[in-house]
UniProtKB/Swiss-Prot annotation:
Its main location: membrane. One of its GO terms (molecular function) is phosphatidylserine decarboxylase activity. This is Phosphatidylserine decarboxylase proenzyme. The gene is psd. The record marks G253, S254 as: Cleavage (non-hydrolytic).
Length: 322
């Protein structure tokens, strides 16, 4: 009965306005009130603040600052084996497995369309038919920055407007085509393991979705699909990210979907639905063997990442939109 009531609310409540209100409130500096809200949130969701770079809740000027708090480097070590892809987010695996032609498993008895997830982009969908997928759910208590499973060169980003259903286990089991209906940002990378898509899915009360190379992608919510492309390799203007490096973030919780090309990776055997994930832990293993490099490449300094994030050049210049 309670679950039926919760599902009914998903269709009745004004999700867009609730999301706008939450985003507005979370961005406000309210002094002692902000600290009180953060303290209550930490207590209710049992957030482990010892992992944060700033464990004192009084150090956060807004709720959003707290929500996207960076962690101490040593608490999420990255697996350095060049044959291993790592978890992109802290959370719980909702579903994982093989993409059956155009079908991706959402929950038991529920599939959705790969092509619909990719906003009808059949050329991109062709890269992943019969490939592998992993869906990771980020709960409110989790760290909400998203990282790279492997080295990658960004080739394309697509913003897809949509609904703002919650993306928890209840809605995944009961709302048809959930991830292909919700607002999302699709990021396509060239990697050593073939093409990889990392998709950031919005939800109710997700105030914004951001990337380190373009800043805030949504809001504004203009109701139109937007597309950006980048050059390959070392060409001017290319965007290269390293394994374990931050690539985006949510302001309030949501879901990350990873798509891998067929025959390129095998998921780690012990992973299953509801497995807990931590950034940097093994996610998949290459079907080919790579030689360990003599030296690991150095990631971009944190301050450079923040500078790129704050600049938001692509949000201001939308000449490549379609």
């Amino acid at each position: 009965m309670l679950n039926s009531f919760k599902l009914s609310l998903q269709y009745i409540l004004p999700k867009l306005w609730l999301t706008r209100l939450a985003g507005w409130g979370a961005s406000k500096r309210a002094g002692w009130l902000t600290k009180l809200v953060i303290d209550l949130f930490v207590k209710y969701y049992k957030v482990d603040m010892k992992e944060a770079q700033k464990p004192d809740t009084a150090s956060y000027r807004t709720f959003n600052e707290f929500f996207v708090r960076p962690l101490r480097d040593e608490v999420r070590p990255i697996d350095t084996d060049p044959n291993v892809l790592v978890m992109p987010a802290d959370g719980v695996i909702s579903q994982l497995g093989k993409i059956e032609e155009d079908k991706i498993l959402q929950a038991k008895g529920h599939n959705y369309s790969l092509e619909a997830l990719l906003a009808g982009n059949y050329l991109m969908a062709d890269l992943f038919r019969n490939g592998t997928f992993v869906t990771t759910y980020l709960s409110p208590r989790d760290y909400h920055r998203v990282h790279m499973p492997c080295n990658g060169i960004l080739r394309e980003m697509i913003y897809v407007p949509g609904d703002l259903f919650s993306v928890n286990h209840l809605t995944a089991q009961n709302v048809p085509n959930l991830f292909a209906r919700n607002e999302r940002v699709i990021c396509l990378f060239d990697t050593e393991f073939g093409p990889m898509a990392q998709i950031l899915v919005g939800a109710t009360i997700v105030g914004s979705i951001e990337t380190v190379w373009a800043g805030t992608i949504t809001p504004p919510r203009e109701g139109i699909i937007k597309r950006w492309t980048w050059p390959a390799g070392e060409n001017d203007g290319s965007v290269a990210l390293l394994k374990g490096q931050e690539m985006g973030r949510f302001k309030l919780g949501s879901t990350v979907i990873n798509l891998f090309a067929p025959g390129k990776v095998n998921l780690v055997e012990q992973l299953e639905s509801l497995s807990v994930t931590k950034i940097g832990q093994p996610l998949a293993v290459s079907t080919e063997t790579f030689v360990t490099p003599d030296a690991e490449p150095s990631p971009l300094p944190a301050e450079e990442i923040e500078a790129e994030h704050d600049a938001s050049p692509l949000v201001d210049d939308k000449k490549d939109q379609v």
